[in-house]
Amino acid sequence: MDQTLSKEERNELMDLLQITRAAWGNLSMMKKAYKNVSKLYHPDKGGDSAKMQRLNELFQRVQVTLMEIRSQCGSSSSQVAWFFWDENFRTLGAFLGEKFNEKIIGLYPTCTKFVRANCNCIVCLLKKQHAGTKKNLKKPCLVWGECWCYKCYLVWFGFPEDFTSFRYWTLLMANMDLSMLKLWTELGF
């Protein structure tokens, strides 16, 4: 996601969204904040039209760039969908329902540290996707959003590899749109 906006623009967007700058990259939180502040800034509701215009410009650039980045990643036959940015996108958590906690990781911490070839937990699937992306693009994953695996999350946000960081990552994954993860084929679709 670092490729989407300059540092100054990222800070400006997060300020316009009225959420902490540390939340940059938390797409679910950013999307929810966008919906809330759009009502606040909308000129028809007495808001600031200049802020609304700038918010739309920056947020649209994030959307377009992220879609382009994700369309080049992974091995699933699914495409990144524009409907992620719509209101009723289907999240991984909603899709897996009560099985989310058992499907997110097969064996903690083993799956976070090693690729388990026969494991189909989300951690291992995303780790395999990460390896495929690196192989296909002949470069490492450089930004959060190009890859959603746990290791890239740790590197991108600078978090330690511990259970607390893992739980925060699982919360992001629970609220992540299935099409953004590009795991349709791997999940049996």
Swiss-Prot record:
J domain sequence ranges: 12-75
Lineage: Viruses, Monodnaviria, Shotokuvirae, Cossaviricota, Papovaviricetes
Localization (cell): Host cytoplasm; Host nucleus
SUPFAM superfamilies named among the record's database cross-references: Chaperone J-domain, T-antigen specific domain-like
Assembly with partners or alone: Interacts with host PPP2R1A; the interaction inhibits PP2A activity.
SMART domains: DnaJ (SM00271)
N-acetylmethionine: modified positions: M1
Protein's organism: B-lymphotropic polyomavirus
Gene Ontology annotations for the cellular component aspect, listed alphabetically: host cell cytoplasm; host cell nucleus
Keywords recorded for this protein, A-Z: Acetylation, Activator, Early protein, Host cytoplasm, Host nucleus, Host-virus interaction, Metal-binding, Oncogene, Phosphoprotein, Transcription, Transcription regulation, Zinc, Zinc-finger
Zinc recorded as keyword: yes
Mapped zinc finger ranges (C4-type): 111-124
Protein name as catalogued: Small t antigen
ZnF (H1C3-type) residues: 130-152
UniProt GO molecular function: zinc ion binding
Highest taxon in the source lineage: Viruses
Main location: host cell
Pfam families, sorted: Papo_T_antigen (PF02380)
Domain-related comment: The common region of ST and LT proteins comprises the J domain. This domain is essential for multiple viral activities, including virion assembly, viral DNA replication, transformation and transcriptional activation. This domain is also required for cyclin A-transactivating activity of ST.
Record function comment: Promotes efficient viral genome replication by accelerating both G1 and S phase progression of the cell cycle. Inhibits host PP2A by binding to the A subunit, thereby displacing lower affinity regulatory B subunit. Inactivation of PP2A in turn results in the transactivation of cyclin A and cyclin D1 promoters. Late during the infection cycle, ST may induce dephosphorylation of host MTOR, leading to the inhibition of cap-dependent translation. May establish and maintain high levels of viral genomes during persistent infection in cell culture.
